[in-house]
Amino acid sequence: MHLFIGVSLRPLGHGIPAPYAVEDICTAKPRDIPVNPICIYRNPEKKPQERRGAGAGEGQDPGVHKPPASGSCPGPTRAFGRRSFLQAPGPTPRTMRRTSSCRPS
């Protein structure tokens, strides 16, 4: 009985395509891959870029600039003018920013 079931189901197994390993998922076609892969495309000829601000200003927030050396800058300036009464008291990073030219922009 087991032999009969095995022999009768064998032709059905030949009709199902067998999964095979794809060498490079980034060049394979979507139908060849059973899942949705994420490919990271890199150009091997291109050298990695150095981070901006590396050196003396390392570890600083890129949005914060140093004030001018003259010392005439009064400090952070408001980016959006006066605060309304609905805003929380005190400066927030969104409403306060430091400018390099000491002029509000």
Curated annotation (Swiss-Prot):
Organism taxonomic ancestry: Eukaryota, Metazoa, Chordata, Craniata, Vertebrata
Organism for this UniProt entry: Gallus gallus (Chicken)
Tissue expression pattern: Plasma.
Subcellular location: Secreted, Extracellular space
Positions of the UniProt region annotated as Disordered: 38-105
Protein name as it appears in the record: Antithrombin-III
Extent of Basic and acidic residues compositional bias: 43-53
Family to which the UniProt record says this protein belongs: Belongs to the serpin family.
Keywords assigned: Blood coagulation, Hemostasis, Protease inhibitor, Secreted, Serine protease inhibitor, Signal
GO CC entries: extracellular region
Assembly and oligomerization: Forms protease inhibiting heterodimer with TMPRSS7.
Major site of localization recorded for this protein: secreted
GO biological process: one example: blood coagulation
Record GO terms (molecular function): serine-type endopeptidase inhibitor activity
Keyword Coiled coil included in the entry's annotation: no
Function: Most important serine protease inhibitor in plasma that regulates the blood coagulation cascade. AT-III inhibits thrombin, matriptase-3/TMPRSS7, as well as factors IXa, Xa and XIa. Its inhibitory activity is greatly enhanced in the presence of heparin.
Residues making up the signal peptide according to the UniProt record: 1-17
